[in-house]
């Protein structure tokens, strides 16, 4: 059995240019994950569930666990001294670490410290999403905004953690997507899913159908296509939507399927955040053989961010399913005008 730490070191040795900094950052994330996982498992016993009454920059009421997880990941990353700054869904602005070691470091981290946190009090799976970039500013100085506003193609690593019936960490550094499952008796992550690959086609679609009347016409047509009876294409497909991006994404990655969060009448730019959610998940999905676009044949990772909390439509999953919904989006786009 290979542990996450051993696997990271193994891959570091396979890259002559590696210096160990990225491995150290992943180690910090692993440590923070263990702390958050422990406290999520105690969420009903201690006062860390429920809303704070405070809204984040997106106008969403923050959960107590959101802020706790945010603090845990920030502290773990700052303590390693390999990151000059962090941008988080829970922070209005990026956070610059001004310790001398941090200022001299080459990397920044962007994260959603606790995805799906509103589900905690009903015991539904939640997750953490992260991505790592090389800073573009000069080391030796504090991080700047431009260090974080980079297209997803510049990611050097991305991953997510799902806190479910078992806790699993999935990550990529551009050489495949790999999954590690936590042994709760030891608190150790072991390699359980090496070189994960999503099927080219699937039979699961994940979308909040309660918003159907607000969807673009192409998405409505695709949903009807998914629900039609057709033996040769194994339709109707199965609708599965948890309301936690990490949970829906993880299931579809393993079984084959598509996750859709389109633009709507009430959210014309989409709802998911490009930097904290879409880019890292797109990197993981592409490394597993899938696709991630904005529904209009634009690759998510090629979009140029203009602000930290930018939102985009998100279509992600098995390549043939993404191809199909994109074709329908294009075919029926004229009906939106």
Curated annotation (Swiss-Prot):
EC number(s) stated in the UniProt entry for this protein: 3.1.3.11
Alphabetical list of InterPro entries matching this protein: FBPase_C_dom (IPR044015), FBPase_class-1 (IPR000146), FBPase_N (IPR033391), FBPtase (IPR028343), Fructose_bisphosphatase_AS (IPR020548)
GO cellular component, one term: cytosol
First-listed, main subcellular location of the protein, grouped into a coarse class: cytoplasm
Co-factor binding details: Binds 2 magnesium ions per subunit.
A family per Pfam: FBPase
Pathway noted in the entry: Carbohydrate biosynthesis; gluconeogenesis
Keyword terms: Carbohydrate metabolism, Cytoplasm, Hydrolase, Magnesium, Metal-binding
Binding site residues for Mg(2+) 1: 89, 112, 114
Highest taxon in the source lineage: Bacteria
Compartment list: Cytoplasm
Chain residues that bind substrate: 115-118, 208, 241, 271
The UniProt record lists the keyword Magnesium: yes
Reactions mediated catalytically: beta-D-fructose 1,6-bisphosphate + H2O = beta-D-fructose 6-phosphate + phosphate
One Gene Ontology term from the biological process aspect of the record: fructose 6-phosphate metabolic process
Cofactor: Mg(2+)
Any one GO MF annotation of this record: magnesium ion binding
Binding site for Mg(2+) 2: 112, 115, 277
Family: Belongs to the FBPase class 1 family.
Oligomeric form and interacting partners: Homotetramer.
NCBIfam families: PRK09293.1-1, PRK09293.1-3
Protein name: Fructose-1,6-bisphosphatase class 1
Organism lineage: Bacteria, Pseudomonadati, Pseudomonadota, Gammaproteobacteria, Alteromonadales
